[in-house]
């Protein structure tokens, strides 16, 4: 029987977890507009700057399954405290990195320790009744969007690239402060929520992967996810270098650009996507989002001024914001109830791999081909992704 005290504890834990998510993503987003200029201060070429992004994603790719299993074994609370506090120290290490190679190491360690998204999701699910989980996960998505909206603006305001690497220490310390505040909030306010582990054999991960890739909707959805995430991550990694080359931008301008795009993304995810899906269905909205991304990529490549480029960036953000919820929904709808977590986890790993390769490839295109080549290549790759989305449009009713 429910009592006011447990309900109050549940609400408090929910608020703290959402605050932790916001602070974590704000710290992550705070660093994004700084990395290209931080790398340049270390005399790194474009391809090495791109690796600064990929190193984090590679660490996160390895950290997600490790910390997820660890949270099942020792509990959510200790894993969250260790990973969040350790991630804060990784920002401090990055602030004092004297070479690009030590910066790579700091980013990798930070990414590994930030592989706690599944632990946060598990903690949120632990304290939420099944019938309320969808709405609470929506709140989690809003916290992500809000953190990514605020973080880049703060980073751009605090950075002083004219001072070399010293000019990036204050924003990196701010990111570390966000992390330490999150860890303290977990230590003080969050109670252990892990349920007793269930006994019994589980299907091998390779078998779950094989069945997922054999499904016509899931397989196509994962391919589209990989293409779009790799393209967007590559653009994200080289956007600072491209806008500096094209328009003479610095961290402040880039930070405010990401903030504006974050506002648009939050609106699209929180309000617009649901309305579009209710009216047209996920496959049609997914296809429209891919077309918008394709248009935006070309628009940016051909843009004569930054005003036009931002219109193109808005199209890309709009398309990406309505694509990913539809992809997740389609994959979830095609997955048996007892394999939701495993299958969606496989797609998360798939997207993490895309975030590793996308920035490296885009960095090579920037250095060896053309500063805006990543826009063109991503637009080309979106065309087969759109064809796959049209196939899902035909297959979804019978395959799901």
Predicted regions and their residues:
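Juxtamembrane intracellular "pre-TM" segments in multi-pass secondary transporters
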Residues: 2-11, 191-223
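Short amphipathic helix-loop junctions that connect adjacent transmembrane helices
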Residues: 33-47, 237-253
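Helix-breaking motifs and short loop linkers at transmembrane-helix boundaries and internal kinks
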Residues: 43, 75, 96-101, 303-304
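Helix-to-loop junctions at the C-terminal end of transmembrane segments
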Residues: 63-75, 268-282, 366
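Structural signature of the two symmetry-related core transmembrane helices
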Residues: 78-93, 284-299
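Cytoplasmic helix-loop-helix junction between adjacent transmembrane helices
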Residues: 105-145
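Helix-loop-helix hairpin linking two adjacent transmembrane segments in secondary transporters
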Residues: 140-187
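C-terminal membrane-cytosol helix-exit motif in multi-pass small-molecule transporters
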Residues: 177-196, 388-393
């Amino acid at each position: 029987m429910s009592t006011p005290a447990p309900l109050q504890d549940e609400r408090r834990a929910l608020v703290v977890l959402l605050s932790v998510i916001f602070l974590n993503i704000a710290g992550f987003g705070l660093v994004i507009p700084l990395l290209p200029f931080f790398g340049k201060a270390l005399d790194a070429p474009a391809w090495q700057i791109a690796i600064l992004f990929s190193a984090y994603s590679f660490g996160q790719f390895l950290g997600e399954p490790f910390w997820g299993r660890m949270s099942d074994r020792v509990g959510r609370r200790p894993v969250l405290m260790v990973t969040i506090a350790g991630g804060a120290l990784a920002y401090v290490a990055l602030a004092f990195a004297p070479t690009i190679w030590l910066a790579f190491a700091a980013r990798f360690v930070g990414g590994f320790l930030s592989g706690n998204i599944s632990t946060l999701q598990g903690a949120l699910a632990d304290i939420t009744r099944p019938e309320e989980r969808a709405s609470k996960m929506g709140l989690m998505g809003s916290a992500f969007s809000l953190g990514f909206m605020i973080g880049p603006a703060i980073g751009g305001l605090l950075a002083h690239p004219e001072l070399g690497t010293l000019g990036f220490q204050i924003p990196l310390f701010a990111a570390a402060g966000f992390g330490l505040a999150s860890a303290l909030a977990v230590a003080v306010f969050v109670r252990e929520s892990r349920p007793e582990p269930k006994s019994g054999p589980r299907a091998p991960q390779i078998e779950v992967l094989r069945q997922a890739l054999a499904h016509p909707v899931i397989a196509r959805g994962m391919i589209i996810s990989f293409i779009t995430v790799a393209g967007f991550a590559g653009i994200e990694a080289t956007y600072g270098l491209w806008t500096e080359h094209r328009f003479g931008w610095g961290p402040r301008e880039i930070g405010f650009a990401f903030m504006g795009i974050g506002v648009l993304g939050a609106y699209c995810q929180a309000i617009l996507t649901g309305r579009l899906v209710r009216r047209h269905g996920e496959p049609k909205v997914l296809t429209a989002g891919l077309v918008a991304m394709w248009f935006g990529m070309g628009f940016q490549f051909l843009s004569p001024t930054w005003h036009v480029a931002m219109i193109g960036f808005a199209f890309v953000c709009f398309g990406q914001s309505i694509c990913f919820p539809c992809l997740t929904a389609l994959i979830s709808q095609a997955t048996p109830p007892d394999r939701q977590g495993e299958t969606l986890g496989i797609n998360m790993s798939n997207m993490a791999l895309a975030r590793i390769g996308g920035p490296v490839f885009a960095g090579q295109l920037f250095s060896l081909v053309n500063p805006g080549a990543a826009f063109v290549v991503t637009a080309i790759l979106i065309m087969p992704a759109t064809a796959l989305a049209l196939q899902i449009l035909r297959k979804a009713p019978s395959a799901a």
